[in-house]
Amino acid sequence: MSSNVIKNNDEVIANKSKALLKRIPTKKNRKQVENALEYSIKMHEGQVRKSGLPFVSHCIDVANILIDWNMDHTTVVSALLHDVVEDTEVKLSDIEEEFGSDVASLVDGVTKVENIAFRSKEHKQAENFTKLFLSLARDLRVIIIKFADRLNNMETIQYLSSNKRQEIALETKEIFVPLAHRLGMAKLKWQLEDLSLKCLDLRAFNSIKKKIETSTRLNEDILSNAIRPIKSELSSYKIKSNIFGRYKSISSIHRKIENRGKKFEDIYDLYAIRIVVD
């Protein structure tokens, strides 16, 4: 690797690290995250992703996803270290000594899920995997870290070979999507579904994406007009609520087209409204 690439990568990691630390609200938590960052950078030194970026960039991205999901700082610290035991000479006892038993437990959980569930052919079937995954991940935060890890890997999957992309996308579709649905993580479910479809059937993905972007049936006014009377009715009964509206995901529309044998123009349920009451 040339000195210019190394210098650029160092700058990327430095900038990513600064941006991450700015998102940590308290001084105490920020110091713990900073320690984990420095440790991860040191231990992953020399390891490079297929994108050409240092491996630790992935760890930082996963930590940022978890902050987006409002996870606690212990989970964020664990995310920065989630591949250290798996991919370096560091032992779990080292993590416990340096960062405490809670972080070590989460890192251990992620490592076990990766080693046992993902690398065993007998567990590749979705139902078998789900049962094993849930039994291994006794702390829900292990699953959440693994979800964030998979989301980032899917977001950067373009750097892998075609065969590897297909394999990971299919695994995501058959295992992670149903698991996200089972745990009520609706947004993550459709994010992973869309990213999987993009890998498995790019032509269909781009076709539907283009039609969504150009369709006169999809606009914010229609969505707002649908939400307004619902909000008004709930307010009249003094029911506290949050109402979220969005367009149906590309993968959801694709599924309707495939299952019903219809064209995009014949699909009318293009919006989704979620009502959360207090």
What does each model-found stretch correspond to?
Residues 1-272, 277-278:
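Active-site helical microenvironments for divalent-metal-assisted chemistry
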